[in-house]
């Protein structure tokens, strides 16, 4: 039997940043040609970076929401770049703002089929209603994440607060399903290659 094990890829990190100062969004919108600002429709200024590819919603209060990062390093680099950009255009933001990850979404592959009908009875805090949704919804308590598990072995993990949480949750899920006997590992493993993170 193949023991390829699980793999995953981070799809999105959502983080909040406290810039520590109030901002004049009108002035910044005039000075930043790439900024989107339409206060009648949305109270925040939108900035999009291309490297790393991240969107930021910036509010007058100095709160900022960043989405799109694929890893924590990209997130840190983006926040630094955004702070520099704001400061270069008239803001006075401290260079080391408080960054808090709110949610990490990752897709993954257990490289094995899962018997969802059996798994729902064996996992605590699991829900499976195939007539409403094809995946089993599993609320893991530690780390505190929600994992969608599909019969094909594909998974989606949400709610993690760090990359380490994702790695721990995916490996823990794999081990649990294997121990419960509801994981059918095929010889040779799948052809699809995903970026496998170290666990």
Curated annotation (Swiss-Prot):
One of its GO terms (biological process) is DNA-templated transcription initiation. Gene3D superfamilies: TATA-Binding Protein. InterPro entries: TBP (IPR000814), TBP_archaea (IPR033711), TBP_CS (IPR030491), TBP_dom_sf (IPR012295). It holds the Pfam family TBP. GO terms for molecular function: DNA binding; DNA-binding transcription factor activity. The keyword ATP-binding does not apply. Keywords: DNA-binding, Repeat, Transcription, Transcription regulation. Sequence repeats lie at residues 10-86, 101-177. General factor that plays a role in the activation of archaeal genes transcribed by RNA polymerase. Binds specifically to the TATA box promoter element which lies close to the position of transcription initiation. Belongs to the TBP family. This is TATA-box-binding protein. The lineage of its organism: Archaea, Thermoproteota, Thermoprotei, Thermoproteales, Thermoproteaceae.
């Amino acid at each position: 039997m193949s023991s390829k094990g699980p793999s995953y890829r981070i799809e999105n990190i959502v983080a909040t940043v406290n810039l520590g100062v109030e901002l004049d969004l009108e002035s910044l919108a005039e000075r930043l040609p790439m900024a989107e600002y339409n206060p009648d429709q949305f109270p925040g200024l939108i900035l999009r970076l291309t490297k790393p590819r991240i969107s930021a919603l910036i509010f007058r209060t100095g709160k900022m929401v960043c989405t799109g990062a694929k890893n924590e390093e990209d997130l840190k680099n983006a926040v630094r770049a955004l702070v520099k950009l704001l400061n270069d255009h008239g803001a006075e933001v401290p260079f080391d703002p408080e960054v808090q990850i709110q949610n990490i979404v990752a897709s993954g592959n257990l490289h094995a089929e899962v018997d969802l009908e059996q798994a729902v009875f064996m996992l605590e805090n699991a829900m499976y209603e195939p007539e409403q949704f094809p995946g089993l919804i599993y609320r893991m308590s530690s780390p505190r994440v929600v994992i969608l598990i599909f019969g094909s072995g594909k998974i989606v993990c949400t709610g993690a607060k760090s990359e380490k949480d994702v790695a721990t949750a995916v490996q823990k899920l794999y081990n649990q399903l294997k121990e419960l006997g509801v994981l059918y590992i095929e010889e040779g493993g799948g052809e699809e290659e995903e970026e496998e993170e170290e666990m």
